[in-house]
């Protein structure tokens, strides 16, 4: 009898041990649909937020900006995990003729999450296809972004995939929307001449208009080289400031606003993908290069364009290739 009792007790304990994991497994299985439902709801909410924010930005741009017509641009699609963009700061000269205040080429590597930026001096004396030799920024006035792309390719071996012409007002709006408290900048000297604002030396938080003025200032011994250096400083600072939740959540609205102030052939998907990857996962430091590089140019006086930079093309082409190919 004692043996039979012991056997029954053993079976009950054995059944309890085997049934307990089954009950836990069933509970996990029952929870799985709930978890999936929560994930789906969150994804839907995220999509709705992005679409709503983007449309809000577009509506703002429609009310305050002018319609823009996309230019022809035949940059090669390379499918190498990188995106390259010709970024032009645009202003209106007297008489309404467009001109480029700054010429940059930005490359973002989706695989290594690295961004590189080249600043091209606008006074480079270059061969402009169909027009002869002129300062390189003349190419934009003569034939828009496409002629400038051809000029960069011919003279420097730079052939970007996309272009973006940034209206100065759009830059100001973007800064004020993303960072309403201002962008921290160490202003190296008092600045006011021909920039539309008055800046005092020292550490300040600059709004969109002030930051634009800081980046455009050129009336010091450094001239355009100093301005390019400050533009690169601004880009570095913006990258560091963007890596926070409050800024990232505003990106969809800012993308919508920029549609009214940036003339570009980059599709919306490309803007979102690059912006989010760069803002969230990209390295904080943006590598930069100024073209022409040191000891590769000389100041010359030309009959048609006045003072210009005569560059060693081969030296600069190799420096650019090394810079872009470096991991």
Curated annotation (Swiss-Prot):
Span of the signal peptide:
none
Q: What is the membrane topology here?
A: Single-pass type II membrane protein
Those parts of the protein on the Extracellular side are: 53-327
Which intervals carry biased composition (Basic and acidic residues)? 1-18
Entry keyword Phosphoprotein: no
InterPro entries attached here? Answer: LytR/CpsA/Psr_CW_biosynth, LytR_CpsA_psr
Q: Where is this region: Disordered?
A: 1-24
Q: Where are the transmembrane segments?
A: 32-52
Top-level taxon of the source organism: Bacteria
What keywords are annotated for this sequence in UniProt? Cell membrane, Membrane, Signal-anchor, Transcription, Transcription regulation, Transmembrane, Transmembrane helix
Which protein, by its recorded name, is this?
Regulatory protein MsrR
**Entry's Gene Ontology cellular component terms:** plasma membrane
Describe its function.
Involved in SarA attenuation. Affects resistance to oxacillin and teicoplanin, as well as the synthesis of virulence factors.
